[in-house]
């Protein structure tokens, strides 16, 4: 094999001739050339290397005798960095030198070539083949690993006492033969008296490995020789667990006939039936149910087989379990039912199967509705199914579950609004969801998102347009606070009846105001526990650096929706800070125009919840438009 090198655009091939040219040099001369080549490469920059290599790298097995591999680097190792001509030659030289020094073990060579005569001759010559190498491997282990039956027999005849001797990984010859699928070697060892239940360091027996490899013949032979079908590995898994995970019915039949317990549990309380349900192995599930396995088995965390099948979306398994009487009202340690997890995963068909058999009382006790989970994951189809089944659309999250969310959300509607899911929001509102139940009103979330469609839906269904945040009190509606950075949005809310009067009811009036608070985000900071938080004044919030530059236009918009008000000294400071805002100060001077005051009086009489009905009043169109602020002249 030749390696193509492209240096400065000149392709070259390193062949046997160039190798011979360099191989005559001494090591000191080669080192000197390496230094010079490295300096030259740095001077002229990188080169482009294209290496032709085989698609698969042939490596010796991990158990290979260490004294025959420790000094040998892999022949076909790939190099990631480009190499110059000299590096390639040096690599070939070093490999050749190493291979010349590597010892060839005659015993291993004889075993790999199945040379029984050579092996027997060595034994007769007095060579001790019962001494392990530093990994604990005997020639017997090698013969079992490579499946060389004749060599195995010869070694056993010479050293019968080592038949069950283990490597440093606690592997016997029987274990190695099973792992490699050498059934003839396995059978010979068992006939010769090998113990079938000796496990490796992971407590995995030959029978366990045979099930893992789906080797039916090996399983049958091991069971015939009384291998323990209920032995547990360090995870508590039995051979039956392993065969169920692979849906190997033939092996399962052999194991159960050989005494395997269908209710054996691993370290996490998981039975073979639980494994079948979890991994969606329907045939294995049917087999275990036929042999009396508990359909309602639960793991250590109380999750049932049905719960796991729902979580992993195994529809046919869920259908079979329910047909066998599986209890759909068993909760896991978190109080979650199969319906909860199916709603969370968005599996419509499984939800439809669970709805008729799920207790509404158990759902209420859980402290969370499937509606919450469907809305949280935007599973609209499942949400429709749950609403069609008349689940309580206003069911709140239990306090301990609400505390898991920073905003202390409670309703399914809140989840839909947070996700900006207009369709789910509409579904929930049409089903009767109350938009005013959460600590933070969903309308405020919609304002933060800037979604007019969601805002309109919430307001049409009774959302409080003057919503406040109880945990962060303000002297003016939080809806105004959230909309300040978008004047068109602020006007939209004011048109729909938001109350702007509190913005001009300052505690300090024309008197001096206290210093502005430090520039920390007080609306994200938790209030001090030793005193109740004070309400934030409008002028205080308007003084925040990110808002103050819009102070004039914000005040201008709000003045269109209030009567005779008094600007406090701080608001006047903001207006005076920019000469073009002087007209706003004049606009605020009382008395306000009579037409404007009449408009406010009419709108107040109608009320904020009926303001959308202005078009139905028996008034001229021009007056209607004036009342709706469509004509501000």
From Swiss-Prot:
It is found in: Cytoplasm, Cytoskeleton, Stress fiber; Cytoplasm, Myofibril, Sarcomere, Z line. Keywords: ANK repeat, Cytoplasm, Cytoskeleton, Phosphoprotein, Repeat, Ubl conjugation, Ubl conjugation pathway. Pfam families: Ank_2, Ank_3, Ank_4, SOCS_box. CDD domains: SOCS_ASB2. Residues 579-633 form the SOCS box domain. PROSITE patterns: ANK_REP_REGION, ANK_REPEAT, SOCS. Monoubiquitinated. Its main location: cytoplasm. The keyword Cytoplasm applies. GO terms for biological process: actin cytoskeleton organization; cardiac muscle cell development; cardiac muscle cell differentiation; heart development; intracellular signal transduction; proteasome-mediated ubiquitin-dependent protein catabolic process; protein ubiquitination; skeletal muscle atrophy. One of its GO terms (cellular component) is Z disc. ANK repeats lie at residues 102-131, 135-165, 169-198, 202-231, 235-264, 268-297, 301-330, 334-363, 366-395, 408-437, 438-467, 474-502. Pathway: Protein modification; protein ubiquitination. Residues 26-45 form the UIM domain. InterPro entries: Ankyrin_rpt (IPR002110), Ankyrin_rpt-contain_sf (IPR036770), ASB2_SOCS (IPR037330), SOCS_box (IPR001496), SOCS_box-like_dom_sf (IPR036036). The modification Phosphoserine is found at residue 369. Component of a probable ECS E3 ubiquitin-protein ligase complex which contains CUL5, either RBX1 or RNF7/RBX2, Elongin BC complex (ELOB and ELOC) and ASB2. Interacts with SKP2. Through its interaction with SKP2, likely to bridge the formation of dimeric E3-ubiquitin-protein ligase complexes composed of an ECS complex and an SCF(SKP2) complex. Interacts with JAK2; the interaction targets JAK2 for Notch-mediated proteasomal degradation. Interacts with TCF3/E2A; the interaction is mediated by SKP2 and targets TCF3 for Notch-mediated proteasomal degradation. Interacts with DES. Belongs to the ankyrin SOCS box (ASB) family. The SOCS box domain mediates the interaction with the Elongin BC complex, an adapter module in different E3 ubiquitin-protein ligase complexes. Substrate-recognition component of a SCF-like ECS (Elongin-Cullin-SOCS-box protein) E3 ubiquitin-protein ligase complex which mediates the ubiquitination and subsequent proteasomal degradation of target proteins. Mediates Notch-induced ubiquitination and degradation of substrates including E2A and JAK2. Required during embryonic heart development for complete heart looping. Required for cardiomyocyte differentiation. Involved in myogenic differentiation and targets filamin FLNB for proteasomal degradation but not filamin FLNA. Also targets DES for proteasomal degradation. This is Ankyrin repeat and SOCS box protein 2. It comes from Bos taurus (Bovine). The lineage of its organism: Eukaryota, Metazoa, Chordata, Craniata, Vertebrata. The gene is ASB2.
């Amino acid at each position: 094999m030749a390696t193509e090198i492209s240096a400065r655009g000149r392709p070259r091939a390193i062949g046997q001739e160039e190798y011979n040219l360099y191989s005559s040099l001494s090591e000191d001369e080669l080192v000197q050339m390496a230094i010079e080549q490295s300096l030259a490469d740095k001077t002229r920059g990188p080169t482009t290397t294209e290496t032709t290599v085989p698609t698969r790298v042939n490596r010796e097995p991990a158990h290979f005798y260490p004294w025959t591999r420790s000094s040998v680097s892999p022949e076909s190792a790939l190099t990631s960095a480009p190499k110059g001509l000299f590096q390639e030659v040096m690599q070939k030289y070093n490999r050749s030198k190493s291979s010349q020094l590597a010892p060839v073990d005659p015993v291993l060579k004889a075993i790999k070539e199945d040379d029984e005569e050579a092996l027997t001759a060595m034994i007769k010559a007095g060579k001790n083949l019962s001494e392990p190498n530093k990994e604990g491997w005997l020639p017997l282990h090698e013969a079992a690993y490579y499946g060389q039956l004749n060599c195995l027999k010869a070694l056993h005849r010479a050293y019968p006492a080592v038949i069950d001797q283990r490597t440093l990984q606690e592997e016997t010859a029987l274990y190695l033969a099973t792992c490699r699928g050498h059934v003839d070697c396995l059978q010979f060892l068992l006939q010769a008296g090998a113990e079938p239940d000796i496990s490796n360091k992971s407590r995995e027996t030959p029978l366990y490995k045979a099930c893992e490899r789906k080797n039916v013949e090996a399983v049958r032979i091991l069971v015939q020789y009384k291998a323990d079908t209920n032995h547990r590995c360090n995870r508590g898994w039995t051979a039956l667990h392993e065969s169920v995970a692979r849906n190997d019915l033939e092996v399962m039949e052999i194991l159960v006939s050989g005494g395997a317990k269908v209710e054996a549990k691993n370290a996490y309380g998981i039975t073979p039936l639980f494994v079948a349900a979890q991994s969606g192995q329907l045939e294995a599930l049917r087999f275990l149910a036929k042999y009396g396995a508990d359909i309602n088995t639960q793991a250590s965390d109380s999750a049932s087989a049905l719960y796991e099948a729902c979580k992993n979306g195994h529809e046919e398994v869920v259908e079979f379990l329910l047909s066998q009487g599986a209890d759909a009202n068993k909760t896991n340690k978190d109080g979650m039912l199969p319906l909860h997890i199916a709603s969370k995963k968005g599996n419509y068909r499984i939800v439809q199967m669970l709805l008729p058999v799920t207790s509404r009382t158990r759902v209420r006790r859980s402290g969370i509705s499937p509606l919450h989970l469907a809305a949280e994951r935007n599973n609209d189809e499942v949400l429709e199914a749950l609403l069609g089944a008349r689940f309580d659309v206003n069911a709140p999250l239990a306090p301990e579950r609400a505390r898991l969310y920073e905003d202390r959300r409670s309703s399914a509607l809140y989840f839909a609004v947070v996700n900006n899911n207009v369709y789910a929001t509409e579904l929930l509102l049409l089903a009767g969801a109350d938009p005013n139940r959460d600590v933070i009103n969903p309308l405020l979330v919609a304002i933060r998102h800037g979604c007019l469609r969601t805002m309109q839906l919430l307001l049409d269904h009774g959302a409080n347009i003057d919503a406040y945040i109880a945990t962060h009190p303000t002297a003016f509606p939080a809806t105004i606070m959230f909309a300040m950075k978008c004047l068109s949005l602020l006007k939209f809310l004011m048109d729909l009846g938001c109350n702007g009067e509190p913005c001009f009811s300052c505690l300090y009036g024309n008197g001096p105001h206290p210093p502005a608070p430090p520039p920390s985000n007080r609306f994200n900071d938790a209030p001090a526990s030793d005193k109740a938080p004070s309400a934030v004044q409008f002028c205080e919030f308007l003084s925040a650096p990110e808002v103050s530059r819009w102070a004039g236009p914000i005040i201008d918009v709000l003045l269109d929706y209030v009567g005779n008000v008094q600007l406090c000294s701080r608001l006047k400071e903001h207006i005076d800070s920019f000469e073009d805002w002087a007209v706003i100060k004049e606009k605020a001077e009382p008395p306000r125009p009579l037409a404007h005051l009449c408009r406010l009086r009419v709108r107040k009489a109608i009320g904020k919840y009926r303001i959308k009905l202005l078009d139905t009043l028996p008034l001229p169109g021009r007056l209607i438009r004036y009342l709706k602020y469509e004509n501000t002249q």
